[in-house]
Amino acid sequence: MKLQLMICLVLLPCFFCEPDEICRARMTNKEFTYKSNVCNNCGDQVAACEAECFRNDVYTACHEAQKG
């Protein structure tokens, strides 16, 4: 779990709640990178793009670390 949390903190700003328009733009683009894949666990604001973000292993590890 500590390793997952470290990966999360180093590669993905989990605390950053992106605006809806950015989320929608990334959903349209369908091309995710470490820098742009900043979906988070902030609630309904990003619910629409969380399914896409889960395709990224780093985000998945981050999400699991947040839950744990």
Curated annotation (Swiss-Prot):
Whether Disulfide bond counts among this entry's keywords is yes
Disulfide bond in keyword set: yes
Q: Where in the cell is it found?
A: Secreted
From what superkingdom does this record's organism come? Eukaryota
Where would you say this protein principally sits, based on its record? secreted
Q: Where is the signal peptide?
A: 1-17
The molecular function terms in GO held by this entry are: toxin activity
Instruction: Report, as the record phrases it, the tissue specificity of this protein.
Output: Expressed by the venom gland.
Q: Which residues carry this modification: Lysine amide?
A: 67
List cystine links: 23-53, 39-49, 42-62
UniProt KW keywords = Amidation, Disulfide bond, Secreted, Signal, Toxin
- Give additional notes from the record: Arose via modification of ancestral neuropeptide hormones (ion transport peptide/crustacean hyperglycemic hormones (ITP/CHH)).
Protein name in UniProt: U1-agatoxin-Ta1b
